[in-house]
Amino acid sequence: MFFRNLTLFRFPTTLDFSEIETLLPQVQLKPVGPLEMSSRGFISPFGRDEQDVLSHRLEDFLWLTVGGEDKILPGAVVNDLLERKVAEIEEKEGRRPGGKARKRLKDDLIHELLPRAFVKSSRTDAILDLQHGYIAVNTSSRKSGENVMSEIRGALGSFPALPLNAEVAPRAILTGWIAGEPLPEGLSLGEECEMKDPIEGGAVVKCQHQELRGDEIDKHLEAGKQVTKLALVMDDNLSFVLGDDLVIRKLKFLDGALDQLEHSEGDGARAELDARFALMSAEVRRLFLLLEDALKLSKAEA
């Protein structure tokens, strides 16, 4: 269940989540209808085993999961059938249908195909830290993260969550770290980075599996390139790549964190899941607070 990416948003810590368990069943995922392309709603974080449990709270951490069902209707299939239909009309009537007629034909085909289309299921998990006012979504896509915010907004009626905003330019901070400026306590450089020329359409350099403080990197910095992605390690617990868009990618829990699971109490799948949730939530909080200080992240106003 460990998250692999983090797209973060902030919300006011004054928000009231006391009614969340009552509200979520009203916005639970419904099966996609015969003539619908997609459906979204909340599902159980625990999967099929506990379908009626739509949230999970542990102290100040709240785990929510947005589920989705999408009809798979390949565009190539629709277009192929459309061309056949157009050819039939042309042969029968001696004319090719115009733009509006083709659009109507295409809509009719989609309407006909939808009830028979395969359905693809998906889930997007999120952890809300109610004490510090942030939500971490397990995605590297800002759009997917915004979709989760929209679903929570639909459940609560109002959810003034905003993407992270740094009071200092993230590129400047990342570039400074790779150039030799001291990193925050607990952080160290990894072995991956991406550098870009600041001009639009400028050169992009990607480095992997190499020492990030050396002559080769220095030459790129001297040429004016700026760091847009940087691999970092937090203690011996987490490794990740931080982007100048403030999205955390390639998140990995290391032995320093995983060793703590050996001392968890309780037996069974649910107890193990609780232990992993507690560990992940605590480590993500540590990382967030570290980055909040280093990047001067703005707080959300009520």
UniProtKB/Swiss-Prot annotation:
Function text: May be involved in recombination.
Alphabetical list of Pfam families matching this protein: RdgC
Name by which UniProt lists this protein: Recombination-associated protein RdgC
GO biological process assignments: DNA recombination; regulation of DNA recombination
GO molecular function: double-stranded DNA binding
PANTHER family cross-referenced by the UniProt entry: RECOMBINATION-ASSOCIATED PROTEIN RDGC
Keyword field: Cytoplasm, DNA recombination
Coiled-coil regions listed in the entry: none
Family: Belongs to the RdgC family.
Location in the cell: Cytoplasm, Nucleoid
GO cellular component: bacterial nucleoid; cytoplasm
